[in-house]
Amino acid sequence: MSKRLLLAGMIACCLAMPVVILAADKPPKKGASVKAVKAMSVQEQTALALSAAPPHISKDAGVMVFGEDGKLTEARKSANGFTCIPTVMNLPAPDPMCMDAAVQQWVTDLTNNAPKPTNTVPGIAYMARGGSHFEKGGQVVMSGEGAKNVSEPPHWMLMWPFDAAGTKLPIAPNPSGVYIMFEGTPYAHLMVYQDPRKMK
């Protein structure tokens, strides 16, 4: 499964390093570039990656970090089916994500421009530091061309083909904290604006 995460960087160990963990708990530096994340040590990248998930997930999760060649490589094997990476879009700050095997497949399919995701079960992904998405004309879109970048709060995702017509769920961020991202595409999925760090 780790090979699937060598997917163009998805742009798309720290249990023995408490000092590094504390550093990763600080707010991410605004304007940080992917290059800056890649320049971090393995320990720093590991701490950043693991900060994406609830403690009961991150403690046994695998970790992928950027190597000297700029590609993601396995730094720690997963003992619970989840794998964490130090950043995704990095706009405007590091946005680590921790995902299960189904989401890894989903991401691989998206990166490879597959017609639709091929995961056969719903996938779960955590982004406890928040992230960002593109909006154009008041709608969340997949491409950044001509769109504005909008920051997102801490959240988790359910990668499964949700349909707004059938579920009656919103298709844009709203006060309820739940919406379908990429509605109308095969990659539609559920966004839940709930802080993973508060999950027990």
Predicted features, each with a name:
Residues G9-P18:
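Bacterial N-terminal signal peptides
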Residues K26-K200:
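Primary mode marks residue(s) on the alpha4-beta5-alpha5 output face of response regulator receiver
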Residues M1-M10:
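Bacterial N-terminal signal peptides that target proteins for export
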Residues V19-A23:
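Sec/Tat signal peptide C-region and signal peptidase I cleavage site
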